[in-house]
């Protein structure tokens, strides 16, 4: 079924000219414009469809709910778009900034109370879903305001915000981290002899680039402005265009914050009066910027640091043998913690969300004490999580224009419950 609905502008009175009483002029009350009248502002239009099936097989022993959906939003509202200050204002309240499409599916499968052997029976459930969003159109001025001028240089602790047409929100953009320079530029000959890394520019084939004077071209951070010369112990970032400068030309796509698959599964086993209920949830295929680890390894300020920094670069030649070392400590200086794939991790996980073990007493036993039902149970929540993510909890919220970042938020608590249920 296809339906067109809409949303009214999020801020009121934007189609009127508003004047505010402010100050005085020649001993009279002064007034000034309070807004810019938006004569072209339109309702946001949403056109969506949903196709679903409810299936039951073998007398509903196996059931399935399948849903496919698509949602196309036109004249999408974007808040506080920047405008030239010559207008007397720095931004508009809102505007119709673009179009976006969301589409995906959700499938729920259930196997209901199937007999396994004797008094043992079970139920099973499985859910998996996928949602993809795509920016199909956006006002060029708004797009430029989000993405910058195109010459924005990545900085320490920052991942670039990018919105590209026909791409999803939540994409991660940054540099590619390639390790640590074992030697400084002045030790080029020694580095060459050992086959070790040194901050010199190389072409696409890995050959050293030499300048007009016959000396190797040194690697810099943002050569045209900052002109910071990389040294031994500094982080190596891939020079995508092989110009000897790490800058905006070297920013690449690092992955999406949106998972490829989300869902859960579980089972419940029954044996006489006993039952075991286990429920899992999972997420697969999303990327997380582990900013907590970044801050714990940056060695840039006076904050507490991870024990991993004990294995940092300290002297010329450290790491030349291929051993893993972190970049050197540089208090308040350097560019060793730029937003790169060094801190981007796979956020996939499998979590045992709930587990309950219970026993229901037989009716003939409990009727003697005036009860119609009595059961005892013990349960636990968030009992374990299987993941390769190095942070405290991979279940980080995602969605919106920004990237998914983990700033050491408080993880979900693990809990246990012992209970008794009685019915009179």
State what each model feature region is:
Residues 73-74, 255-257, 285-287, 394-396:
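A short local loop/turn or secondary-structure capping micro-motif enriched for an aromatic residue
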Residues 31-32, 243-248, 332-341:
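Short glycine/proline-rich turn/loop motifs
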Residues 229-232, 283-375, 379-380:
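Extracytoplasmic gating/loop element in the C-terminal half of outer-membrane beta-barrel translocons
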Residues 94-101, 144-159, 163-169, 254-264, ...:
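C-terminal extracellular loops and terminal segments
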Residues 125, 249, 259-273, 353-358:
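Conserved SET/PR-domain catalytic core that frames the SAM/AdoMet-binding pocket
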Residues 6-21, 142-146, 176, 180, ...:
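Membrane-proximal, glycine/serine-rich, low-complexity loop/turn segments characteristic
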Residues 114-255, 297:
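Conserved small-residue
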Residues 1-165, 339-424:
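Extracellular/periplasmic, surface-exposed regions of secreted and cell-surface proteins
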């Amino acid at each position: 079924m296809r339906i067109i609905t809409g949303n009214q502008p999020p801020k009121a009175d934007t189609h009127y000219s508003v004047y505010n009483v402010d100050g005085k002029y020649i001993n009279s009350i002064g007034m000034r414009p309070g807004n810019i009248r938006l004569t072209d502002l339109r309702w946001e239009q949403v056109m969506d469809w949903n196709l679903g099936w409810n299936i039951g097989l073998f007398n509903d022993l196996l059931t399935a709910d399948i849903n496919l959906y698509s949602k196309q939003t036109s004249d999408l509202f974007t808040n506080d778009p920047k405008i030239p200050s010559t207008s007397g204002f720095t931004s508009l309240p809102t505007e119709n900034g673009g179009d976006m499409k969301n589409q995906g599916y959700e499938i729920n499968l259930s196997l209901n109370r199937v007999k396994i052997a004797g008094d043992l029976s079970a139920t099973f459930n499985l859910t998996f879903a996928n949602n993809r969003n795509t920016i199909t159109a956006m006002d060029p001025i708004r797009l430029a305001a989000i993405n910058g001028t195109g010459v924005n240089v990545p900085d320490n602790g920052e991942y670039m915000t990018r919105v590209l047409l026909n791409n999803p929100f939540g994409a991660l953009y940054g540099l590619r981290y390639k390790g640590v320079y074992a030697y400084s530029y002045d030790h080029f000959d020694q580095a060459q002899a050992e086959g070790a890394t040194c901050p010199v520019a190389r072409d696409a084939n890995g050959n050293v680039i030499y300048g007009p004077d016959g000396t190797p071209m040194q690697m810099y951070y943002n050569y045209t402005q900052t002109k910071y010369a990389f040294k031994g112990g500094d982080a190596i970032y891939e020079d995508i265009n092989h110009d000897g400068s790490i800058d905006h030309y070297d920013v690449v796509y690092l992955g999406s914050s949106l998972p490829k698959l989300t869902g859960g599964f579980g089972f419940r086993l029954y044996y006489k009066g006993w039952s075991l209920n286990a429920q899992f949830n999972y997420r697969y295929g999303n990327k997380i910027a582990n900013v907590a680890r970044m801050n714990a390894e940056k060695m840039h300020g006076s904050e507490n640091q991870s024990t991993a920094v004990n294995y940092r670069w300290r002297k010329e030649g450290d790491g030349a043998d291929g051993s893993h070392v972190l970049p050197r400590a540089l208090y308040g200086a350097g560019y060793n913690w730029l937003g790169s794939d060094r801190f981007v991790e796979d956020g996939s996980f499998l979590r045992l969300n709930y587990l309950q073990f219970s026993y229901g007493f037989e009716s003939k036993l409990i009727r003697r004490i005036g009860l119609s039902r009595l059961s005892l149970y013990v349960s636990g929540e968030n009992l374990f999580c299987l993941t390769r993510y190095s942070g405290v909890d991979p279940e980080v919220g995602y969605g919106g224009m920004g990237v998914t970042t983990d700033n050491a938020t408080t993880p979900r608590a693990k809990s246990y419950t012992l209970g008794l249920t009685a019915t009179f």
